[in-house]
Amino acid sequence: MPVRDTFGLVPPWAEVGLYVLFAPFAVVFVVGLWRRLSWAGLRRIVTHSSGGIAAAIGRFGRFGLLQRRVAQRPRGWPHLGIFLGFLVLLAATTIVAIDWDITRPLGFRVLIGQRYLFFESFADAFGVVFVVGLLAALIWRLVRLRSTGPDQRRIQYQFLVLICGLLYLGLTGFVLEALRFIIHPVTWAGWSFVGVRLASLLSSAGVGPIAQTTYEALWWTHAFVAFSLIASLPYTTFLHSVAAPLNLMAQPGRPQKELSTPFDLRQLMETGEFDVKVGATSLSDLDSGLRFALQACTNCGRCDEVCPAMAMGTALSPRRLVQALRARLLAGLTSEDVLARNVVKHADLWACTTCAACVEACPVFIRPVDYIIPFRRQLVAGQQIDKRQTEFLANLSRSSNAYGLPAEQRNQLAAELRSAAGSSDE
């Protein structure tokens, strides 16, 4: 009867040795993840998400599992393949561990008979999806590397290392499967349609005599690379695989184009406590949700591509702004005055038109505008504005328009603007 023999082709001590090897990697992973995310992500899903847990799960399904924003562009399809393939293969590995370490000692096997055969075919199919997605992503990253600016080189190299590591796992997974069929042929090998074909190719190449040695070497290197990627997750761009889904699920209830407010005047009137901070100078002044969202950023640049201020040639880059704040967060500099240290430049803050195009473009629902507005408010509250900006704000306060025109001339101005717009169209 078909049954999964997980450690059948390695020495008896390898099973214990594998878990001993995994232990230090697991410690590095858990400590790093706790330092990066703590329990803030889960807490925000419960306390901040719009519509409760059901709505949070719905957002995760639409924008996490189905990658609706990511897949809107052709370059997003490889990511969808990588994501789905990784998710299925991770689930498959988990099922294998449960079958061998939990149910087998209890006298029950999960991966046996027809269940095991369907499992093998399903895993092979999504393994192909995983590898194809990684190959497409690798080609795209290598092509893009030529035009990448210095500020993005480091993150691009991280992505390349991550892609190569995952690709190694995908390819060696198939090779290990093929070697298993060479060493121990079975009648049901056809259900593993990739492994059985690769086994035929390797046999034709004369791998048979060294199949056992090759299998053991690949088995250990496969495990080592997998454990290394797990341990690196909290410290590299791979962190977005955890932070992004949590940020998707923990979205606030207000519309994407609605600006944040530092306080509710009605609540202040009711409580009588008027000691409020209008703006922000450091990350510690921002809402915990905004600080958490920084860790979900993948530096993809979609916000830059749709930013009208950047298209007009201003210095503003929503991507660079978020990445600069993210770097301070990961360095633990949450109390640093980012305005005084010029981490966030005044010109960048005033270049933003608050159109929220970046908010709509972000695949993980980061809101760059929500970082800009508090810092801009601080500049106004601290009178760190030039004469033109002072006049602009005074005109808005005095006459409700930026030009300082009397209220009775507003209709005339609107008519002139419509006329000018009409003549330009002609």
Where are these regions (language model features)?
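Short acidic (Asp/Glu) and glycine-rich catalytic loops that position anionic groups and cofactors
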Residues: 37-41, 224-225, 300-304, 352-356
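Peripheral terminal and linker regions in Fe-S/redox and tRNA-modifying enzymes
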Residues: 17, 32-33, 74-80, 87, ...
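Flexible gly/pro/ser-rich segments immediately N-terminal to CXXCH heme-c attachment motifs
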Residues: 153-157, 161, 210-220, 286-298, ...
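Active-site-adjacent bridging/hinge elements
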Residues: 202-203, 297, 333
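Alpha-helix boundary/capping residues
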Residues: 68, 245-248, 328, 379, ...
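General structural signal for alpha-helix termini and helix-helix connectors
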Residues: 67-71, 309, 381
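Ferredoxin-type iron-sulfur electron-transfer modules in oxidoreductases and energy-metabolism complexes
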Residues: 265-294, 302-304, 310-405
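Membrane-embedded alpha-helical bundles of multi-pass integral membrane proteins
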Residues: 1-280, 323
